[in-house]
């Protein structure tokens, strides 16, 4: 079954819009949705997942604050999820403009959102873990190649039991909450 853990509107915007990339000397540019597919072996038992470039604001922010050679943002969507989103696009169900359906103006995207389960109701049916991380590649102090993966893994059963929220929502919300607490405390 296809049931995004986030709003289908957000899912479509992030996954089907041309992803923004940044490279030193080239600046910002876009590429094709689902480009640069790679299988990434996620930690803590999650394992290998197909990851692709998606549109996300970090690609705008990071090069403004950090001296980087390349910045990209990827989601580990998996082959079935990617295929489903490509099919939604191929059928025109990602369109915002309305079409006439028996005298009623309907946005295909709104119809899709109405037909899919409400992501807010999915938490108790979701299983497994989610991982958010940053892979940084470069050179160490001796000039040797080094890669560091900083990440956070959340188990859906844990987030549901402790917070009543599914893991993807919890993981999205926790960083701004921590930032607000730090700012509040000075």
Stretches found by the model and what they are:
Residues 1-186:
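C-terminal catalytic/substrate-binding lobe primarily of soluble NAD(P)-dependent oxidoreductases
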């Amino acid at each position: 079954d296809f049931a995004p853990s986030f709003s289908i509107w957000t899912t479509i915007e992030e996954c089907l819009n041309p992803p923004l990339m940044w490279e030193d000397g080239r600046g910002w540019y876009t590429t094709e949705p689902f480009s640069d597919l790679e299988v990434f072996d996620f930690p803590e038992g999650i394992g290998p997942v197909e990851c692709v470039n998606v549109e996300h604001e970090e690609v705008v922010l990071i090069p403004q604050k950090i001296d980087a050679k390349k910045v990209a943002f990827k989601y580990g969507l998996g082959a079935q999820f990617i295929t489903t989103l490509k099919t939604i696009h191929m059928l025109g169900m990602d369109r915002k403009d309305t079409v006439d359906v028996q005298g009623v103006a309907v946005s295909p995207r709104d119809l899709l959102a109405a037909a899919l389960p409400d992501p807010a109701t999915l938490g108790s049916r979701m299983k497994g873990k989610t991982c958010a991380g940053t892979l940084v590649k470069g050179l160490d102090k001796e000039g040797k190649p080094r890669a560091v993966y900083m990440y956070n893994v959340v188990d859906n059963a844990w987030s549901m039991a402790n917070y009543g929220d599914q893991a993807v929502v919890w993981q999205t919300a926790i960083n701004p909450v921590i930032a607000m607490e730090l700012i509040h405390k000075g």
